[in-house]
Amino acid sequence: MPKVGMEPKRRAALVSAVIDEIGETRSLDVTVAQIARRAGMSSGLAHHYFGSKEQMLIAAMRHILSEFSTKVRAELRDASTPRDRLEGVIRANFAPHVFDPRKTSAWLSFYALAQSKPDAAHLMQVYQRRLRSNLLFDLRKLSPQADEIADTLAALIDGVYLRAALREGARSDAAHLQVSTALDTFLKQSNTR
C-alpha cells in the first residue's frame, strides 16, 4: 500500500535528481536508473511517477522556470520605476539560486532538448515570450528602440548562461553586472540618437 503524502516528495526528489544528474554530467545522456538512484528510489518508482525520462526532464525544466518566475515576480513587486523593474528582471535571471552551476548546465541541456521535443520547445517559447514581455513593458517607457534592446538583452542573458554552462567559476554577481551595464549603455545610446 502506498504511503499517503509521499508522491509530492518523491516527485520533488526526482526533479532535483534530474537537475543534479544533468548538472554533473553536463549532458542529457543520463538514465532513469541514474536519476532514480540519486533520488534514493527504484527506476520502477521513477517511471511510475513520470512515465518516461522525457517527462522527468520536462518536469525539471518546469521547476527551474517556476523558481525563476517566482523570483521575477518578487523583484517586480519591489520595484518602483521602469529602470528598477528592468534591473529586477536582470537580477532575477542571475540570482544565486537560479544561476548556480548545476542549473546552468541543466538549462543548456534543455535548450538542446527543445530542438527535438515539442513539450520542451513549448516551455522554452513560453520562457522567451515572458522574458521579452517583461523587458518590453518597461523599455517602452524608456526608449524608442525598446524592441531592439529587449531582443539584444534576451540574447545577452542567454549567451551569459551558455558561457556559464561551458566553463567553471561563473559568478552570478559578475553576470548581473555585465547585463545591467549593457542595459545602461543601450538606454544611453538610444536616447542620444
Which role does the model predict for each range below?
Residues 1-9, 191-193:
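N-terminal intrinsically disordered/low-complexity leader segments
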Residues 2-3, 16, 24, 60-88:
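Amphipathic alpha-helical linker/stalk segments
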Residues 13, 17-24, 71, 75-78, ...:
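Solvent-exposed, amphipathic alpha-helical segments
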Residues 13, 17-55, 59:
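Helix-turn-helix
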Residues 59, 73-103, 150-153, 176:
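Hydrophobic alpha-helical connector segments
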Residues 98-122:
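Amphipathic alpha-helical segments used for helix-helix packing
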Residues 120-125, 140-193:
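Hydrophobic/aromatic-rich alpha-helical bundle segments in the mid-to-C-terminal region
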Residues 123-130, 134:
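Short, solvent-exposed amphipathic helices
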